[in-house]
């Protein structure tokens, strides 16, 4: 079977471009969060953007391995890419969760197609990325709900909150609104994700 004539080849190309695009969109979102002093949110968004970069890298590597006997100079790719993000924090958290949900659906279908076409390795790659995208969706939903409801920095149990600026440690169900040592705002503190969503 000529790999260049398969749906799996088309899906690999789309997935690569989609992950590159997601990384850049999330970096825009992260930039907006940092500009508004929301370092805790920005740190998590930055980690997810970096993971999207690595998804693109893995897809690119797989694509190169599959076409090594048919070197490519240019790859034609035509499909829709989400273009929802704006400069509103809540909207962007909601949009990124939606993006991740759509990615997970794409990977589920692409994995099935790759397996049907006999590319088990590509199918497994798609499925592994799908699992991460599902987690990303849950993280963005958690951040959205916490930011919207004002519970992002609150916990039912006592936790240790360390100021990222000066290292001052507070123990409680939420950090002080302002660090008593350096006066950094609570929004700069690391957002504590639930254990099932932690990196």
Language model feature labels by segment:
Residues 1-199:
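Non-heme di-metal
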């Amino acid at each position: 079977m000529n790999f260049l004539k398969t749906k799996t080849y088309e899906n690999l190309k789309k997935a690569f471009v989609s992950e590159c695009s997601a990384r850049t969109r999330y970096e825009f979102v992260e930039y907006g969060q940092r500009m508004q002093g929301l370092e805790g949110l920005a740190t998590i968004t930055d980690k997810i953007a970096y993971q999207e970069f690595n998804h693109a890298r893995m897809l690119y590597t797989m694509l190169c391995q599959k076409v090594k006997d048919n070197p490519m100079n240019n790859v034609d790719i035509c499909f829709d890419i989400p273009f929802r993000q704006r400069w509103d924090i809540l909207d962007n958290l909601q949009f990124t969760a939606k993006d991740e949900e759509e990615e997970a659906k794409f990977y589920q279908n692409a994995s099935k197609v790759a397996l049907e076409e006999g590319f088990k390795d590509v199918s497994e790659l798609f499925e592994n990325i799908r699992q991460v995208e599902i987690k990303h969706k849950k993280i963005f939903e958690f951040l959205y709900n916490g930011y919207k409801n004002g519970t992002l920095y609150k916990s039912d149990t006592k936790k240790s909150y360390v100021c990222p600026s000066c290292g001052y440690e507070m123990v409680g169900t939420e950090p002080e609104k302002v660090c008593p040592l350096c006066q950094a705002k609570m929004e700069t503190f690391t957002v504590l994700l639930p254990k099932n969503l932690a990196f």
